Amino acid sequence: MSKIIAINAGSSSLKFQLFEMPSETVLTKGLVERIGLEDSIFTITVDGEKQKEITNIPDHAVAVNMLLKKLTENGIVKSLDEIGGIGHRVVHGGEKFADSVLITDEVLADIEELSDLAPLHNPANVVGIKAFQEVLPNVPAVAVFDTAFHQTMPESAFLYSLPYEYYEKFGIRKYGFHGTSHKYVTERAAELLGRPLESLSLLSCHLGNGASIAAVEGGKSIDTSMGFTPLAGVTMGTRSGNIDPALIPYIMEKTGQTVEEVVNVLNKKSGMLGLTGYSSDLRDIIAKEEEGDHRAKVALDVFVSRIHKYIGSYTARMKGVDAIIFTAGVGENSAIIRERVLEGLEYMGVYFDAKRNNVFGEEAFINFPHSPVKIIVIPTDEEVMIARDVLRLGNIG
């Protein structure tokens, strides 16, 4: 048995989960927030109870030291020698990484180089990796990339209709994201269906504040809705999803905003927040719709219609589907959104059962038994995928 930490480092946060492997038992989990700001918050779960501490955490190295100290203080590990491996979520692996990889100096340099493609995320991921290297230099560390799963997409899916030299010189192409989540739920779907993954055509709907759809054929991603960045695809909480690119100079001209300001609007002030004017949270928007709010209704209609576009096009790409999977915050917990997405899909063999659909955050088949296409709710678990990859690549006994 070995203890493995799964880490997701943001620019001012550090999310962690400690596993006993290979049993995949979660020993503890927690979150460090507001790193580098006043009143940093450290939260850890001990014996099922959340402990919260407000303190000064100036950087990620201090956060890591505090985390490791809490593990020993609370008897979660007897000593740091019990930690056999560390897995780091890294947002962008570009074309260089089609799988998770053991972190070396060379790999770390490559991740830093790819920061151009993910300026908000990769630098923070690197800071997290370096912080652990300082404290646990001899413990194997593995990078798990959000983009890696989608590296199986064919050129017809990942190339944009732009001058080919842009792809050759600048790496401009579709990369896709949420790969670790799509991989987990499609593998789990095959187990639940009792069929080999290689024989299945699956539609994976990762619907949260960020949302993406993936077409997975024979266990391989053949297309996905996010693009060069996580801004593309379906309408999201605060992100616009796909728009006509000519809108950017038009908005700049009309508002006097810079490119950076317009892109910030597309990332942080658009999507459901932009359409409603008051919230990015679908629960708020559904409640408002029930009160008769027109913009809430329109926003929800837009959200569902954009998902339908991908379901239709990916079903055509795969010449039919065996199952549709719902995962992430909205996909796992909103029976209303699932119902609206599935309504009217009988033409493609989708027959959902409204009674069975009344589930929240648990695995369930929500189709009628006679439905040719199965519909499965599967809570995602990116952390366990990270831990599995550490076990697989870290030579951990």
From Swiss-Prot:
Identify the InterPro entries for this entry: Ac/propionate_kinase, Aliphatic_acid_kin_short-chain, Aliphatic_acid_kinase_CS, ATPase_NBD
Q: Which sites bind Mg(2+)? A: 8, 382
Family note: Belongs to the acetokinase family.
GO MF, one example: ATP binding
- The residues responsible for catalysis, as annotated, are 146
Q: Where does ATP bind?
A: 15, 206-210, 281-283, 329-333
Q: Which Pfam families match?
A: Acetate_kinase
Provide the cofactor note recorded for this chain's UniProt entry.
Mg(2+). Can also accept Mn(2+).
Alphabetized UniProt keyword annotations: ATP-binding, Cytoplasm, Kinase, Magnesium, Metal-binding, Nucleotide-binding, Transferase
Which locations, inside or outside the cell, does it occupy? Cytoplasm
Tell me the protein's name: Acetate kinase
The site feature described as Transition state stabilizer is recorded at 178, 239
Q: Kindly state which reaction or reactions the protein catalyses.
A: acetate + ATP = acetyl phosphate + ADP
Q: What does this protein do?
A: Catalyzes the formation of acetyl phosphate from acetate and ATP. Can also catalyze the reverse reaction.
Binding positions (substrate): 89
Q: How does it assemble?
A: Homodimer.
What does the record give as its pathway? Metabolic intermediate biosynthesis; acetyl-CoA biosynthesis; acetyl-CoA from acetate: step 1/2
* Organism (species): Bacillus cereus (strain ZK / E33L)
Q: Name one GO biological process term.
A: acetyl-CoA biosynthetic process
Q: What taxonomic ancestry is recorded?
A: Bacteria, Bacillati, Bacillota, Bacilli, Bacillales
Q: Which cysteines are joined by disulfide bonds?
A: none
| Superkingdom of origin | Bacteria
Which NCBIfam families does this chain map to? ackA
Q: What is its EC number?
A: 2.7.2.1
Query: Needs which cofactor?
Result: Mg(2+); Mn(2+)
Q: What are the record's GO terms for cellular component?
A: cytoplasm
